[in-house]
Amino acid sequence: MESYAGKQFVGIDLHRRRTVIVRTTEAGEVLEAVRIVNDVQRLASVMARAGQCPEVVLEATYGWYWAVDALQAGGANVHLAHPLGVK
């Protein structure tokens, strides 16, 4: 895991029991890729490393509500993506 002071972009692949989170720089360099058990506190812990107001994209799939609530509570700008519309 690298320290990075600039704006971060985060992609989240949310599944029923686990989630994959990838943090990147503005240039697209991967800072961290982790797989966590779905838990609000664990998500908040990983997202704390993304700095203030990270841009987060999350697939709008079944059960995304809790994650969006937790991300927004932590100051993230959340963007929902349609599963069939993202390439």
Show the residue positions of the predicted features.
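Phosphate- and other anionic-substrate recognition elements at nucleic-acid/protein interfaces
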Residues: 1-87
